[in-house]
Amino acid sequence: MKFSRFVSILVLFGLLTKVQGPSLTDFLFPRRCPRFREECEHRERDLCTRDRDCQKREKCCIFSCGKKCLNPQQDICSLPKDSGYCMAYFPRWWYNKKNGTCQLFIYGGCQGNNNNFQSQSICQNACEKKSNST
């Protein structure tokens, strides 16, 4: 009798955490933001202020000159080049994993992804050193 109550409470707890908050593995193995700090040409607008501003598997991290929502389990340097859908003209750098170099592209100013750096040196420090160590 006591055991079945205990199991029912565990099942209910498991269902509620999936609906209302982080999963049990997030408590046991907390995710961390990348430890990447760089001198920036200019500070970018923060896209978040805390983890609650981000989607389920993302954290609000200081990354590439501003606060951004990142999935700590995702390799940012593996993301494809994404100019976004706006029509601004911002020269930026992205890491091309196929040839292992940072390449210039034009960012439209909104959306896109986090494989988007202000300078070639910031891109290299974030991605090339990481890929050389693996």
Swiss-Prot record:
Main location: secreted
Region (Interaction with SEMG1): 102-133
Stretches the record annotates as Interaction with LTF: 117-133
Signal peptide bounds: 1-21
The keyword Secreted appears for this protein: yes
Cysteine pairs bridged by disulfides in the record: C33-C61, C40-C65, C48-C60, C54-C69, C77-C127, C86-C110, C102-C123
Organism per entry: Rattus norvegicus (Rat)
Quaternary structure and interacting proteins, as annotated: Monomer. Homodimer. Homomultimers. Interacts with SEMG1 (via 164-283 AA). Interacts with LTF. Found in a complex with LTF, CLU, EPPIN and SEMG1.
Keywords per UniProt: Antimicrobial, Disulfide bond, Protease inhibitor, Repeat, Secreted, Serine protease inhibitor, Signal
Domain WAP as annotated: residue spans: 26-73
Molecular function terms from GO: serine-type endopeptidase inhibitor activity
Subcellular location: Secreted
Biological process annotations from GO: defense response to bacterium; negative regulation of calcium ion import; negative regulation of flagellated sperm motility; negative regulation of peptidase activity
Keyword Isomerase in record: no
InterPro entries associated with the record: Elafin-like_sf (IPR036645), Kunitz_BPTI (IPR002223), Kunitz_BPTI_sf (IPR036880), Prtase_inh_Kunz-CS (IPR020901), Serpin_venom_toxin (IPR051388), WAP_dom (IPR008197)
Domain BPTI/Kunitz inhibitor: 77-127
One Pfam family, short name: Kunitz_BPTI
Lineage: Eukaryota, Metazoa, Chordata, Craniata, Vertebrata
Function: Serine protease inhibitor that plays an essential role in male reproduction and fertility. Modulates the hydrolysis of SEMG1 by KLK3/PSA (a serine protease), provides antimicrobial protection for spermatozoa in the ejaculate coagulum, and binds SEMG1 thereby inhibiting sperm motility.
Gene Ontology CC entries for this record: acrosomal vesicle; cell surface; cytoplasm; extracellular space; protein-containing complex
Protein name per its UniProtKB record: Eppin
